[in-house]
Every structure is written in C-alpha cells, then in structure tokens.
Amino acid sequence: MDSQRNLLLIALLFVTFMLWQAWETDKNPPATTQTIQQATNAVTGDATNQGVPASGQGKLITVKTDVLSLTINTRGGDVEQAHLLAYPDILGSDKPFHLLETTSAFVYQAQSGLTGKNGPDNPANGSRPLFVTTQDSFELADGQSELRIPMTYTAADGVTYTKTFVLKRGDYALNVDYSVNNTSAQPLELTLFGQLKQSIDLPKHRDTGSNNFALHTYRGAAFSSSEDKYKKYSFSDMDEGLNITTNSGWVAMLQQYFATAWIPTTAGANTFYTSKLGNGQAAIGFKAAPVIIAAGSQQNLNATLWVGPEIQDKMAAVAPHLDLTVDYGWLWFISQPLFKLLKFLHGFIGNWGFSIIAITFIVRGVMYPLTKAQYTSMAKMRLLQPKLQAMRERIGDDKQRMSQEMMALYKSEKVNPLGGCLPLVIQMPIFLALYYMLMGSVELRHAPFALWIHDLSAQDPYYILPILMGVTMFFIQKMSPTTVTDPMQQKIMTYMPVIFTVFFLWFPSGLVMYYIVSNLVTILQQQLIYRGLEKRGLHSREKK
C-alpha cells in the first residue's frame, strides 16, 4: 500500500464519518410556521411531576451580576430570561448571548417549585404562588461577592414560603433555596422540583448552524444518574418518557457551547423525568423525595441551577460529571487530553490559532517514528512489485495459493504489508477528536487567529484555507511515488485534492488550519525520510 491508496482510504473513512455524524446527531425538524402562544410560567407535567396549573402573569424582576442578566417571574419564581454578559450573541455584536428566553416565538425556561399534597404549586390550588419582593431589580454592586434575591409567599393557612436566589460574582451556578415556616396546626407534605422547559422547534433567530452539516451539533436533553455518568435524551426520545430514581446526578438541556442544568442537593432519592408538553414544548426535570414538615417547625429545601457556558473545570466543581456536557462524542478520551494540552499551550502563546499550530507540530513530532516506518514499509512494498507481478502471472487465478505465497514473500523479505496503515489509523482519530474539540469547546467560540480568520470555530468566510489545504494535498500527491496502474484509481487520486477541498469548505477554520500545517509537516518529513531511504537504496527521486 502506498500513500496514494492511503489518501483514498482517508477519503472513504472521512465520508463514512460524515454520514455517521449526520445519522447520529439528533436532527430536530425545522421550525414550523405555527406561532407559539405567549408563554406563561405554567409547569404542565405528567404523573411523575404531578403538574402545576397555568396561571396569570406575575411581576418580572431583573437580576444582574458581572456575568449574568436574568428575568424572574414572581408568579412561581421561574427564570424566564437569561443573558450571558461575557459572550456576544454573534461575532462582533454588542448584544449578549440569549440563553433562556420567553417570547411568542420561543420558550426556554428554568422552573422550580414545591408540589406534593400541601405544596403551593399543587394543581389543586388553581394557580401558582405569587411571590412578593422588596424591589423590582437587583444588581451585584462593585466589591460585592454575593447577591441574594428573596421572594416571599404567604399561603391562606398562614404558612410562609421564602424562595431565595443566591448568585455569586463570576459564577454561573445559582443556589435556589426554599425556607418553609409551617405556622399552621397541620403537618405539610412537600416535594421540591426543578424543570427545564424548551420549545422543540427552533425559530430562525436561534437556528445558527443546522444547514451546515459540518457544524451541526447536538441539541436536546441529557442527565447523569447513579447508573449513567452521562446520557443524552433527545426530544424524539421523550416520546417514550424518562422516569428513573437516583440518589445522585443532574438533568440538563444542551446546545452547542451552552447548557442549563438542575442539580438536586437535598438528601434522598430523586426522580428524573421527561415529558412532551403542549405548544410543541418538551421538558426534563427532577422531583425530590417528599418531606414532612411538622406543625410549628421550619425547614429548608434547595437545589442548584447552572445557566451558562460549558466551562469544564467550573462545571466539574458544581457537580460530578457535569463537565461531560461538553460533547466530545465517542472520541472524548482523545479530545479531552487534546483540549487540556491546547489550553496549556494557550496559556503561554495567548492565541488559540497559534496554539493549534503548536499542537500540530507536537502531534506530528510524536508520530514521526511511525511516519518513518510507514514510508519505509511502502518503499519496501514498491521494490516487491516486480516479484508480485511475476507471481500473479505464474499462479494465475488461484487466489488461495497466491495469498499463501504473498505472505511467504513478505515474511522472507521482512515486510509488513499493513505497515503503511498504522499512522493513518492513529491520525484519523486525532483528526476527528480535534473536530469534536473545536465544535464543543466554548473557549474556541469566536476565538480569532489572524488576518481574515476571526472565529476558529466557524468556516473560513472566503474559503482561502480550504483551497490552501487542497494545494498542499496536491503537492503531497505529486511528490509521492505510486504503484497504482488501474486507470480508475489514477483518476480518483487525481481528483482527491479537489474532493477534499470541497468537503473542507464548510469545516471550522481551526480544523482546516490543523490539516494545512499537518500537510506542510508531512512534506518536510517526507523529504527527510526519502533522503534516508535513498542512501539505503529503497527510494528513487524519479517518479514511476
């Protein structure tokens, strides 16, 4: 096998990967033209969540820290809007990224409350509790490390419920604390729940990548439990519904680079559930174990809500395995070390593009012994071609005998016929792992390189990098000796750089840059190896 056939194999593997990616990724149907009714903060669930009735609109209060801007509805105390102040909506925009949203076109909310026999969110009440706050807006002041938003509701029986949101400087994790003061003469049975509700169809203003097969990523629910560290649960999976009991874990809604998640913190078993709601919406949530609060006593119930970017180290500190929401696909065990190395290099270099170039040199340097072995094996195979051709003419159509004598020849000449494949087998997972890393790491979102490349996670707007990549492939092809004699294979190999260029037109520019640098390193290593092979009589500069 020579380098020409290796390119053909790469193309086959590449096409296979893209077809698999298209099949594996949950592709939700395009947004319908049906208008979603103005969303209320109703929590309409199945038997698992017991449901909460629809209700009128409460007062909207605003909460702002250095990294978050939230809108909370006093009717139920749900988070209806969330802007991430450190992340622009699109490249070059002054508008912050809009994660949670409640509009006529799209609904994405983080809901929480107390259901159960005596819960204020029990459907039998007819409406959700209307909390009272001391002010309409809250903002983290300079020098302040923590912001508390207390909301109070007093039920008809005199029981006081205080729901407090606690936000910290620089943190995307919110503590949601319930303090229940049972001043009634009867015990209370309450169940804490947290739910993430989202419209299944994306409106045009939020659909930023579904038309690009190379940039399409997972959007849907996920959870972690005692049995599964990380499991996706797509909108289509919700037709069957999730209903499990676990002593640990979290539930989440995911999209590229960003996530929301409820992490139960109350001791005891929790029920995780999903459901399809009305108006084309779906939900994933948790229900804590019921608690009994005796008459005249007080008790606290709480949970943690993550609303923000998928920053691995910060998410891991909030809950075990929450960092796995950074979706690196089935090659996560390669992507994660690659990202750690890339982040380490970025700490010294200060530019993600140059860090990718540096990691390319490191990877190709580590693989140089295998690359050298590959070219040596291919050179020996080329020298055996006359003997193999004579063997074919002598043996004819007896395939079994031909195979036996070929293996005997390889053994006597100390040639491994698969020796040229090993570097390819290793390079392809690294290439695909880098693809997942670029598509899943929020640190690379809108990361500039130089000149016209302002976002390494997006395609080259002028297609210059894919064309340069095709040129480097062409030079590698022209400089590589070949034993391909079949006219069809020769024609395929001639068009291979063009085919790859077309494929890479829509790929992240950071990935294309990696491939360009890798090709340039290949050209340098190729010339160095060929000089050594010439001295051993295993290579000639004349291309046959």
Swiss-Prot record:
Metal-binding as UniProt keyword: no
Cystine bridges: none
Bilayer-spanning residue ranges: 6-26, 343-363, 418-438, 456-476, 497-517
CDD domains on file: 5TM_YidC_Alb3, EcYidC-like_peri
Places the protein is found: Cell inner membrane
Recorded coiled-coil stretches: none
Keywords: Cell inner membrane, Cell membrane, Chaperone, Membrane, Protein transport, Transmembrane, Transmembrane helix, Transport
Gene Ontology BP terms: protein insertion into membrane; protein transport
One term of GO molecular function: membrane insertase activity
Subunit note: Interacts with the Sec translocase complex via SecD. Specifically interacts with transmembrane segments of nascent integral membrane proteins during membrane integration.
Entries under PANTHER family matching the protein: CYTOCHROME C OXIDASE ASSEMBLY PROTEIN COX18, MITOCHONDRIAL, OXA1
UniProt protein name: Membrane protein insertase YidC
Native source organism of the sequence: Pectobacterium atrosepticum (strain SCRI 1043 / ATCC BAA-672)
Record gene name: yidC
